[in-house]
Amino acid sequence: FLVAPRRARAEDFTECFFDIAVEGQPLGRIVVAVDEGTLSGRRFVELARGVGGLSYRRTTVDNIEVSGDGDDAVEIYLKNNGVEKFVTPGSDASVDVVGGPSAERLLPDLGKRSHDERGLVSLIVRRDPSEPEPEPKARLVSVRGKFETVYDPPPPPPNGTGFTITLRAAPELDATNVVVGRVVSGDEVLEEISQLPTVKDNTSSPFFAVAKSIGDKRALVAEQAFRKPFRKVQFMKCGVVAKSAPASEDEAPQ
């Protein structure tokens, strides 16, 4: 499903599975056919399979993004934030992942496939270039009885492990995400997740805008929860579907 300059071959595709649970109750399985002919695709497959104890297992659907407001709102994609650090969980041991510890080597894959339909899976590899770069946040702290201004570093850029699954065409993702595959089984599971109630997005509230402009941490925490499902949606298991052995000439149908 990738386009020129390179045509994906059938043997390049690997199927990855994700077993979904809502509040610990099994919901169903999603299977994604991934093009391993790209660096981004190989990275996604490795994280689905697991490397050095690091994988998408136990990560969550963190947001259900929508377009429009109120009764006109429509769900456009599910978002997973990926893994925070390239280390074995519970330790400081670094893990080597295909593509390295950042998204830099994945950037050349941008634009090879548009987010023009439902069921496309893509890695988040950079911030939206149309938005301003985040700046360090100033805050006052008391040092030996005096107030001093300190600056918290801005959030890091995407590390190329978070991903989205489209629920309809989402061309706004073309500037930030690299398509690595498509859902080939479990569309009904996607639909059930998309209908879950989420935390209301209050970015249009003047009170929120003021709080964010002055660096109020409560506003920053609240913003991270916008469009988050009220119920925990988790990838309980994930991995790679074993490929069937090709039929021999004697076994081939006549």
Give a label for each model feature:
Residues L2-Q254:
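Cyclophilin-like peptidyl-prolyl cis-trans isomerases
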